Amino acid sequence: MRFSKMHGLGNDFVIIDSITQKVYFNSDKIRSLSNRFYGIGFDQLLVVEPPYDPNIDFHCRIYNADGSEVYQCGNGIRCVARFVCIKKLTNKQHIKISTDTYSMMLSVLDSEFISVNMGEPIFDPIKIPFFSTQYQKMYVLFVPNFTILCGVVSIGNPHCVILVEQVDLVPVTVLGSILENHHCFPKKANISFMQIISQNNIKLRVYERGSGETKACGSAACAAVAIGIQQGLLKKNISVQVNLPGGDLFISWKGLGYPLYMIGSATYIYDGCINL
């Protein structure tokens, strides 16, 4: 099986073209491949398929390192756009890619940066999904030894965003692993810890559902900016710089009724071949 290794700000992916080769995976095989000592190693596996809709260019299936399938990955989708250009699967500058729940328009800006229309953020708790009797801008979650005040939103996948004073001091792995599996999130959630630097700049650390803390997460950056704007902490209509451990993303949102836009890099590392 041929594959490519890529990363978006250190959030690393194995990308597989299933258009020109036949591939099959189960969760055990994905977990084996994701192992950084005995496999290839990756945060997520991205499988590029032919489109199921004539108005779409490519379909993408997304698997976490634990073998679970998810339906959104902002950093991964940028890498897929770069991948299909590198592999000459398209010559388009504007590429529409679908997942099982979402479709996104991506624009190749130059040899490094990709712009993504991430769609509208969803705050309705039923659609996130999040167990709550009513919509609120902020929710309280109780976990052992902590009371957490957070915002929740879907960017095609569920996100929980927690405002903190010093993000570098947060026990991300401890809190993230507890909150990811909180009973209020029936499909689990990505957990983000956001520090406001200014109205157009934040620092962010992310515990990704099924993967643990990662260097960067595009949909989490979008979720954090959406929550920040919703709370009046960040400005609308400008590019908000999101500082992640792996690098920076730039997110803009006009407000309710409008899509989020993300700009970030997508970096090719190498090609390889492995026997399954």
UniProtKB/Swiss-Prot annotation:
Residue numbers marked as site, Important for dimerization: 270
Pathway: Amino-acid biosynthesis; L-lysine biosynthesis via DAP pathway; DL-2,6-diaminopimelate from LL-2,6-diaminopimelate: step 1/1
Record-level Gene Ontology MF annotations: diaminopimelate epimerase activity
Any single GO BP term: lysine biosynthetic process via diaminopimelate
Catalytic residues (UniProt): 73, 217
Chain positions of site Could be important to modulate the pK values of the two catalytic cysteine residues: 159, 208
Any single Pfam family the record assigns to this protein: DAP_epimerase
EC number: 5.1.1.7
Disulfide bonds: none
Transmembrane feature ranges: none
Major subcellular site: cytoplasm
Listed SUPFAM superfamilies: Diaminopimelate epimerase-like
Residue numbers binding substrate: 11, 44, 64, 74-75, 157, 190, 208-209, 218-219
InterPro entries, per database record: DAP_epimerase_AS, DAP_epimerase_DapF
Reactions accelerated catalytically: (2S,6S)-2,6-diaminopimelate = meso-2,6-diaminopimelate
Gene Ontology, cellular component aspect: cytosol
Compartment annotation: Cytoplasm
HAMAP family: DAP_epimerase
Assembly with partners or alone: Homodimer.
Protein's job: Catalyzes the stereoinversion of LL-2,6-diaminopimelate (L,L-DAP) to meso-diaminopimelate (meso-DAP), a precursor of L-lysine and an essential component of the bacterial peptidoglycan.
Similarity comment: Belongs to the diaminopimelate epimerase family.
The protein, known as: Diaminopimelate epimerase
